[in-house]
Amino acid sequence: MTSYSYRQSSAMSSYGGMGGGPVRFGSGGVFRAPSIHGGSGGRGVSVSSTRIVSSSSGGYVGGRGGSFSGALTVTDGLLGGNEKITMQNLNDRLASYLDKVRALEQANGELEVKIRDWYQKQGPGPFRDYSQYFKTIEDLRDKILGATIENSKIVLQIDNARLAADDFRTKFETEQALRMSVEADINGLRRVLDELTLARTDLEMQIENLKEELAYLKKNHEEEISALRSQVGGQVSVEVDSTPGIDLAKILSEMRSQYEAMAEKNRKDAEAWYLTQIDELNTQVAVHTTQIQINKTEVTELRRKVQDLEIELQSQLSMKAALEGTVAEIEARYGAQLSHIQGVISSIEVQLSNVRADTERQNQEYQQLMDIKSRLEQEIATYRSLLEGQEAHYNSLSIAKAL
């Protein structure tokens, strides 16, 4: 609020009181030269005066409070015509300026009350404290960053699992190719086994044929021996005194022993060869069977690992999808909250801009008011100089009358 005061210490010949009080002029009386005290908005404007001794005839001049609109009456010859007009104009302009000052200060007071009320209603309070939101936003940003890092780790784990799955798939394909090669070898060995079985059957048939032939030869041999014995017996009975002949029985016995030995040797050789081939085939079959079992076990283990990796991959993909959905939901939710907060901040910034504009406008009005006050003080100074001139003139007249 703007206040101004001006105390007039000089005497004047005739002046209207601002507060409605009269100013009395009398012989040997008291004269009070008024001074102006302007309150806020032009309210409470009062006039004070200093005392001087006057011997002039008195009169009463009335005026209205807060202005110089009252008529200024003086004795004839006290003020000149131009000075009266000047003082009247100054009085009118002073009243007009005081009215303007009062109106402007009243408007300024109303604006200040409105601004104060607006700050009380719209100003930052506990419910307008956004620091907790900032902390929440920072926490959410940290959570989003952590979720992003965790998502990156999961993506890296998924890539590692995919690479491991590709590695296991390559190993599986290699083992499958090895398995197919082993199965091809097994099929070849089966064909060899079939051939050996056929050879064994052929050898058994040959052994049977040899046995039959041996039995047939034994039978023929016995028949020949019987025939020879019968012939030898007949010769012995006929030629009793002849020289001893060849012992055919011994010769036949030796031949039979040699033949049986050869047959037994051939049988044993065939049986040994057959048993050797059978043992070799059994050994190869056992070795390949063991290798097949090992390969089957490895293939089963690899299949189980591949299934476990596929299950883990599906689980990681599901977890990734769930985390991506959670991150998207969090971003959407807190994005909406951030948008709301930004909208609130924008609204507050607009309100602050309006307040700044109102403040600038009030500052401009205040500057205008101060300019008016300066001009008013200049006019009051002019008015004071006129009053001092009239006081000097009045004093000179009083001295002249006294003399």
Curated annotation (Swiss-Prot):
Residues 391-403 are annotated as: Rod-like helical tail. The modification Phosphotyrosine is found at residue 394. One of its GO terms (cellular component) is Z disc. SUPFAM superfamilies: Intermediate filament protein, coiled coil region (SSF64593), Prefoldin (SSF46579). The keyword Signal does not apply. The modification Phosphothreonine is found at residue 326. InterPro entries: IF_conserved (IPR018039), IF_rod_dom (IPR039008), Keratin_I (IPR002957). Residues 83-118 are annotated as: Coil 1A. The modification Omega-N-methylarginine is found at residues 7, 24, 32, 43, 51. SMART domains: Filament. The modification Asymmetric dimethylarginine is found at residue 24. Residues 229-251 are annotated as: Linker 12. Pfam families: Filament. The record marks 270, 330 as: Stutter. Coiled coil: none annotated. Residues 252-390 are annotated as: Coil 2. Signal peptide: none annotated. The keyword Signal does not apply. Involved in the organization of myofibers. Together with KRT8, helps to link the contractile apparatus to dystrophin at the costameres of striated muscle. PANTHER family: INTERMEDIATE FILAMENT (PTHR23239), KERATIN, TYPE I CYTOSKELETAL 19 (PTHR23239:SF14). Heterotetramer of two type I and two type II keratins. Interacts with PNN. Interacts with the actin-binding domain of DMD. This is Keratin, type I cytoskeletal 19. The lineage of its organism: Eukaryota, Metazoa, Chordata, Craniata, Vertebrata. The gene is Krt19.
